[in-house]
Structure formats: C-alpha cells, structure tokens
C-alpha cells in the first residue's frame, strides 16, 4: 500500500480578488460516509478526492480486493455504489499501485479526442511504498471510463528505486477550456519531504510542465504531509487541511496522525510574497472524531478545486483504530465548520 507522505493542492484562477480573511468556527458532529469494509468485508479506503454534487463523489486509494494490500482507485457515490475506476495492469511504470487521486475539470486532447476531466494519480511498479511517479488519466465525465496517458507527467526524481519519489498529486483548474491546471505534489527523497507545484498545460497535446517551485512550509514544521487545499476566490485565500504533528507515540500505528490542522494563506503568500506565511485556523482532534487516529484528509471541493459554499469548510477525513487491524478499520467521515 502507498502510504501518503505529503500532499499539496493549489489553484490559480483569474477571478476578482480580495484580501478578506474569514474565521473558521466549530466543527459539526462527523457523518460517516464510507468504509471499504462496506464492500469488501476487510479492506481500506483513504486519501479522498471529494467532489461536491448530487451525489457527492469520493475518489479514493482503495484496496483492490478483500484482505489485499494493493491500491486501486475507486469511485464511491455517497449513498450509492463503489467501483474500481483505475487499476495497475501489464508491466508499465504504474502497473502495481494506483493511489492518491485528484480529479479536476480541464480539457485534455488525446488520440484525436478532447476529454473534459483529468485524474492525477500516484503510480508505481513495485510492491512497496517506493519508486513513485505521477500520472494522469482522462474521461468525458466524472464517472469515467478513465483512460491513462502513457507516460508520467511528473517522473520519479530519485537515484534509487528504493526511494519514495514523487506522488500524492493534487490539482486545481486554471483555465478548463485552455487545458491548464496547477499541479502540486510531494517529493520524498532521503534529503527530506517537500511540496512542489507547477503549471501543467494540455493545450498542445502532451502535458507541458512549467514554473515548477517549492511550496512554503507551515509554521516551524519540517514538512508538509497528507494535506489538501481549497481556494476561496472572493477572499483570494487558500485553506489547507493536513495531518497534525507530532505523530502519536507509545501506540501503533505511529505513521498516521491523531488530529488534523486547518490553516490558510493569502494567494500572494502562497505564490511566494516574502514574509507572508500560513495562519493556523483550527484543529480537529479525537475529542471531535472519537477515534484513535484521524488522518489522510481532503476538502469537499467543486470540480475546479474551489469552495462549493463560501460560508463553510467541509473536511472529509479517514479514521482508524489501533494496530494490529488499524488498516482494515479505515473509514471516511465528513465534518463541517462555518466560515465567517
């Protein structure tokens, strides 16, 4: 299984901007959305790309089959069906694990046809959390079918196949008609884990990656892991949800968090204005979730990566129990806080 190390999502939209900063209120009682055990008896689902609509769609990193640690990407329609929509096959660069989806609306020309949606995903070719790269699949609608482009859009950056590499992509539309998105991802190497971002353009066919940069850290932390962003156009502000640190000690698992942190930053600060950093807005703890581990979160977003409702934030997170069966207890929940 590919364990998420760090993820960053960003957005660049040509919309009216404001420096307004909203306050995040208290979090609602969590609502259970889905667990792989609902379908497989003994499975896992986490790292949601949550798309608002009727129904809400959850694209997740999901066990391929019961009692199997091999990642496919599933689509769950909340209150309805759950099916595998992307899987590793054959002998290519992504034939083993397919994980950590991020779905956005953007035009992508491929093989003589222009598709309307892109799914960025982590793929690898080993039965390990290593040698990861980022690919993209395309579809005419949110339900698929999804067709993989042949090559990674972000290639493995390491020098040894035992290194983690590049993964946990998150993307937001810049201009859907022109085929441009901002793609952000984790680079995990022996030197450390960093968030990176770039513009990806599909306008001329094969993806072109430009303006690559390292993303700012949060506070005094040495890394950004397991987080997602959503953009508020009227405020010109990014809201982030991430796994809190330090990770728990004295009990297992110790590689996922027991709380989430919400922070925000202005658009200018996100894109590198000196002296502008993240503001911590809120925390979601086990006192709210009621479970030993609270991890791998995402925001409920529009197909463009913006807030569906400018007056609230909705987080979709993964809960878990203690080992030895923590993995098989993964469950997706939703909680909402007012934004004023």
Descriptions of predicted regions:
Residues 1-22:
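Secretory targeting and sorting signals
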Residues 47-49, 100-102, 168-170, 226-228, ...:
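Conserved beta-strand position repeated once per blade in WD40 beta-propeller domains
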Residues 293-305:
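A short, acidic, amphipathic alpha-helical segment used as a generic capping/interface helix at domain edges
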């Amino acid at each position: 299984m590919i364990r998420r190390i760090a993820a960053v999502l960003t957005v660049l939209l040509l919309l009216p901007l404001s420096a307004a900063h909203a306050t995040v209120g208290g979090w609602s009682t969590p609502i259970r959305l889905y667990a792989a055990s609902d379908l497989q008896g003994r499975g896992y689902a986490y790292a949601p790309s949550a798309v608002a609509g009727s129904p809400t769609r959850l694209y997740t990193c999901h066990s391929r089959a019961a009692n199997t640690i091999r990642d496919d990407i599933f689509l769950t329609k909340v209150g309805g069906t759950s099916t595998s929509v992307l899987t590793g096959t054959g002998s290519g660069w992504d034939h083993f694990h397919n994980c950590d989806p991020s779905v956005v609306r953007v035009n992508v020309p491929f093989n003589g046809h222009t598709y309307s949606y892109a799914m960025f995903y982590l793929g690898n070719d080993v039965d390990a959390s290593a040698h990861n790269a980022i690919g993209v699949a395309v579809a005419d609608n949110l339900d698929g079918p999804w067709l993989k482009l042949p090559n990674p859009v972000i290639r493995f950056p390491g020098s040894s196949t035992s290194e983690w590499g590049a993964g946990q992509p998150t993307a937001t539309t810049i201009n859907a008609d022109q085929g441009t998105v901002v793609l952000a991802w984790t680079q995990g190497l022996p030197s450390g884990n960093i968030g990176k971002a770039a513009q990806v353009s599909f306008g001329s066919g094969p993806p072109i990656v430009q303006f690559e940069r390292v993303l700012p850290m949060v506070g005094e932390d040495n890394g950004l892991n397991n987080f997602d962003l959503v953009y508020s156009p009227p405020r010109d502000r990014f809201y982030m949800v991430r796994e809190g640190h330090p990770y728990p000690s004295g009990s297992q698992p110790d590689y996922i968090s027991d709380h989430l942190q919400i922070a925000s930053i202005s658009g200018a600060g996100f894109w590198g204005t000196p002296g502008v950093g993240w503001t911590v807005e809120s925390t979601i703890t086990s006192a709210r979730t009621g479970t030993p581990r609270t991890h791998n979160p995402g925001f409920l977003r529009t197909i463009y990566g913006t807030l569906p409702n400018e007056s609230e934030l909705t987080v979709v997170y993964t809960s878990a129990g203690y080992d030895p069966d923590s993995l098989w207890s993964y469950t997706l929940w939703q909680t909402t806080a007012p934004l004023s």
